[in-house]
Amino acid sequence: MSLSMRDPVIPGTSMAYHPFLPHRAPDFAMSAVLGHQPPFFPALTLPPNGAAALSLPGALAKPIMDQLVGAAETGIPFSSLGPQAHLRPLKTMEPEEDVEDDPKVHLEAKELWDQFHKRGTEMVITKSGRRMFPPFKVRCSGLDKKAKYILLMDIIAADDCRYKFHNSRWMVAGKADPEMPKRMYIHPDSPATGEQWMSKVVTFHKLKLTNNISDKHGFTLAFPSDHATWQGNYSFGTQTILNSMHKYQPRFHIVRANDILKLPYSTFRTYLFPETEFIAVTAYQNDKITQLKIDNNPFAKGFRDTGNGRREKRKQLTLQSMRVFEERHKKETSDESSSEQAAFNCFAQASSPAVSIVGTSNLKDLCPSEAESDAEAESKEEHGPEACDAAKISTTTAEEPGRDKGSPATRAQLFPAEPSRARDTARLDKASPDSRHSPATISSSTRVPGADERRSPGREGPVATKVDEARAIPAKDAFAPLSVQTDATAHLAQGPLPGLGFAPGLAGQQFFNGHPLFLHPGQFAMGGAFSSMAAGMGPLLATVSGASTGVSGLESTAMASAAAAQGLSGASAATLPFHLQQHVLASQGLAMSPFGSLFPYPYTYMAAAAAASTAAASSSVHRHPFLNLNSMRPRLRYSPYSIPVPVPDSSSLLATALPSMASAAGPLDGKAAALAASPASVAVDSGSELNSRSSTLSSGSVSLSPKLCSEKEAATSELQSIQRLVSGLEAKPDRSCSGSP
């Protein structure tokens, strides 16, 4: 039997020089007497007064222990043995052979610990204390069911180094700082029987890690200098004091004792689990560890996609605004379907998470990530184009510096382009699978004959800066074809616009070949038309001049911002309520025909052409996922009229899948009526032309259903009223031009 002794034992060789005096018991400590065998006491034990009251004919074994216990119970003053005697409660001196145990400890959640250990486990320490994750949990076995045990854990330094996280890995950064005060954590259920400990998982989840040296949680016990594990004073509490950027190793201890105060005199069984090693940090360094903790910690829900963290709140706000946008659109379309027989479908049913809804009146781009805030979107507008996941957009403006040198710097060329320069060719190509363009990308370019820009009337503020930026772009190409490149229907269905589809026969067709675009730059200065572009690519505001035959025009379903109703242009607007006619101002009052609820090319294709005169490179128009503008044509003339388009009989018609579209007048009445009920989608022939100057309405007006054909006269009168409403817009550019420096 071997017991831990505090006082040093005098070797037997030195004892020969000290005569034994039975009446001078204080010469020997009680621990020395009890710890040694009979070389000195063959048949005598030490009574308190030196007399041989307790005798044992043999070695000092269990009988003498029993006698000592009996003596203690009868009140023998052991203090008389001398001041050096360090007496422990005698019941703890019972031989351990009576209790048979072989404790075994198994670490819980070992797989999770292994995952953290592979990446380099980090534990955050704070001044107030932070719990560990994964929590330290073990399962014990092999304990004596009747004996009582105290279970503890402490955290020790794994080495004498200080670490730093550099180049995605931990490396030694120097020698360790001075060690913090020792602190052990006693399981709050201690002491308990072995049966109780083995019936449950022993968890130390309440242990907290802190870097606060002045932490006062706990109490202190003095361990004897000859203790097998520790010497000196140890504090016990709920918080362990650690140094940041140091590596630590948790330890688990089992002590068979029925009183915590007996810990310094008890035998500790210590267990180490290398996978629980960690580095203490004040903030997580490795993103992989952060994500692993978020994924596995049930208390980290605030950082998850489904939680209420800061990032998730931005996502939820985006999704909420998308829902509001869709609900508003559904309401508007349902209101219009009563009079138009559901002729107009939304271009953008914003169902892709990459589409960010911006509910403000400012012109904003699609955010690259759904969690991007509005402020970030605005900042990106100021710092140039950013690559969106949905598309890659770039805009350049080719100018002729020699043109119009005598004109004022802010004057724009808004007159009809010459026929040789008024040709904008649009080509609908089937992009190769390895194309650099994303599923639906429009690359377009036009020639810019003049370098001067004009500020749009009434909205000079947000446009003026963009005009200056556009003027700073050097000229590159004198002429570049304006082409529309799109992927096949299957690719488009997987892109940001799941509903966008093209008829197979449209591949390689030419669109609006050589037509000047009748647009007013004012509508690009954050009017109602463009406000929702970032919000799902819905507001399709740009229009080409409509056709009185009602077939080759395009529908302008420009969804305005919060307060604006869905507006339709051209003769179709004549059938709408007056509040919808007001919105026609943003879409120029030009007739647009729906194309199978969507368009073979985005409206913003034409929007960007007009936007070049005022928005140019820095405008968020050019970063729309459907735009890739190489140069722009500022020679655009605003016209509130529907422009007749003579379409050859041999040409295919830009038709729609609407079953109720018919034509009121024109050379193709019969063919248009026949195509009205056909879902087939065909393309406008490249030979069709738009007359750039048309001061009068043609004999027929566009109508979208046979029911509306009889309302030509009403439509004509309504269009005339619209003409009067917008007639002042042509005069405003002159006034703004004269007032500008």
Curated annotation (Swiss-Prot):
Please tell me in which tissues this protein is expressed: In adults, highest levels in lung. Also found in brain, heart, kidney, liver and ovary.
Q: Where is the composition biased (Basic and acidic residues)?
A: 377-386, 420-437
Give the CDD domains listed for this entry.
T-box_TBX2_3-like
Q: Which InterPro entries does the record match to this protein?
A: p53-like_TF_DNA-bd_sf (IPR008967), T-box_DNA-bd (IPR046360), T-box_sf (IPR036960), TBX2/3_TAD (IPR022582), TBX2_3_RD (IPR048387), TF_T-box (IPR001699), TF_T-box_CS (IPR018186)
Q: Which residues bind DNA?
A: 107-220, 241-305
**Oligomeric and partner information:** Interacts with PML.
Indicate what this protein is called per its UniProt record.
T-box transcription factor TBX3
Native source organism of the sequence: Mus musculus
